[in-house]
């Protein structure tokens, strides 16, 4: 798929509509705020610390992960195709005094002049929102330095993930707006690893994240049957 066509306008519009609530801790993005400390810790620990490292956050949205990485000393570029989320991200960074370079671009186009440029690349909850995940994964691989880390997170595709993520989170618990996810776009871990294997990345770890609706707490789990992250490293 051509680099400029790997964007779903409906997906962009979906997050444009929700942009103004991005930093509302009790709003539509509350799950991302609750989940973010686990993601940040996993990235920082697995990459051997990101302080002083060049990091790219692909599909950064309103900047929740980008800001948290910048706060612990990473030099962060945030990449997204949504005008409203990027505007929210820039404003919030300005208000909080965090230095982040936000760019409107696709991963594929950004990679053209950022070959082997970053120490760490993150692509969280983004692959299930693009027409061609393989194209994004290849671009992420191209942009990370040899020996550098690329992190992906997405949602497994099975009955349990449909019940938890769509019926539960969207319809019953109202944690997310109805229509945030499409089950057919979810990606099985085996499929994601196969896509990774088509590049110079090697999967080094996989970790699940579970949510307890009674306590409102996310935690790590070895089970990758719903939400999961993988760590990959580029071959030297």
UniProtKB/Swiss-Prot annotation:
MF annotations from Gene Ontology: 2-polyprenyl-6-hydroxyphenol methylase activity; 3-demethylubiquinol 3-O-methyltransferase activity; polyprenyldihydroxybenzoate methyltransferase activity
Keyword vocabulary terms for this entry: Methyltransferase, S-adenosyl-L-methionine, Transferase, Ubiquinone biosynthesis
A Pfam entry, by short name: Methyltransf_23
Keyword hit for ATP-binding: no
GO process annotations (BP): methylation
This protein's pathway: Cofactor biosynthesis; ubiquinone biosynthesis
E.C. number: 2.1.1.222, 2.1.1.64
Binding residues for S-adenosyl-L-methionine: 39, 59, 80, 124
Family named by the database record: Belongs to the methyltransferase superfamily. UbiG/COQ3 family.
HAMAP family: UbiG
The protein's name in its UniProt record: Ubiquinone biosynthesis O-methyltransferase
Gene expressing this chain: ubiG
């Amino acid at each position: 798929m051509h680099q400029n066509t790997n964007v779903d306008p409906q997906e962009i519009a979906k997050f444009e509509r929700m942009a103004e609530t991005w930093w509302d801790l009790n709003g539509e993005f509350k799950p991302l705020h609750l989940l973010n400390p686990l993601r940040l810790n996993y990235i920082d620990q697995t990459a051997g610390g990101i302080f002083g490292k060049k990091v790219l956050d692909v599909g950064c949205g309103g900047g929740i992960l980008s800001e948290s990485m910048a706060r612990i000393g990473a030099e962060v570029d945030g990449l997204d195709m949504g005008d409203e989320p990027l505007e929210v991200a820039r404003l919030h960074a300005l208000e909080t005094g965090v230095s982040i370079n936000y760019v409107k671009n696709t991963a594929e186009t950004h990679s053209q002049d950022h070959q082997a440029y970053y120490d760490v690349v993150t692509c969280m909850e983004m692959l299930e929102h693009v027409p061609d995940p393989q194209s994004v994964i290849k671009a992420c691989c191209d942009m990370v330095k040899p020996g550098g880390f690329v992190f992906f997170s997405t949602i497994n595709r099975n009955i349990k993930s449909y019940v938890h993520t769509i019926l539960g989170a969207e319809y019953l618990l109202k944690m997310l707006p109805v229509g945030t996810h499409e089950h057919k776009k979810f990606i099985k871990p085996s499929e994601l690893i196969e896509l990774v294997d088509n590049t110079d990345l090697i999967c080094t770890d996989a970790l699940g994240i579970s949510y307890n609706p009674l306590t409102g707490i996310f935690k790590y789990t070895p089970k990758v049957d719903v939400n999961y992250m993988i760590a990959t490293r580029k071959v030297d």
